């Protein structure tokens, strides 16, 4: 699959009719199957928008570095898109995050900077 094809797949996910919810409400209700995105998350869309917007506005150029603090799917979405566009990715991630999540990020080429977990209001959340 070409890089262009992968990019085009982001957000191009099917709608699935939710039968029981539709029957209960007497209207058609659909769910968007975002797990069909390349990174298997709705966050692929956000990552694509952020990176393409940064390119368009000349905030980043080929070979640039993206740094993101995340414990979740945003990092995986950024990993998918950054790899395609040729950017390096550094993810600041809590040490407590699952091994599987860390392995997925590394497989996408991300460098992980592991930090102690801290609440968002704690200044330690922003420093190593």
Which residues does each PLM region occupy?
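PLP-dependent amino-acid enzyme catalytic core
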Residues: 1-128
């Amino acid at each position: 699959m070409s890089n262009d094809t992968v990019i085009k797949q982001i957000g191009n996910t099917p709608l699935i009719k939710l039968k029981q919810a539709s029957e209960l409400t007497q209207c058609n209700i659909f769910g968007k199957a975002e797990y069909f995105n390349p990174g298997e998350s709705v966050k692929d869309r956000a990552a694509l928008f952020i990176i393409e917007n940064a390119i368009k506005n000349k905030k980043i150029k080929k070979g640039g570095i993206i740094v993101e603090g995340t414990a979740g799917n945003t990092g995986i979405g950024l990993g998918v898109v950054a790899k395609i566009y040729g950017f390096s990715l550094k993810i600041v991630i809590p040490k407590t995050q699952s091994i599987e999540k860390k392995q997925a990020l590394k497989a996408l080429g991300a460098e992980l900077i592991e930090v102690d977990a801290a609440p968002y209001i704690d200044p330690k959340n922003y420093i190593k």
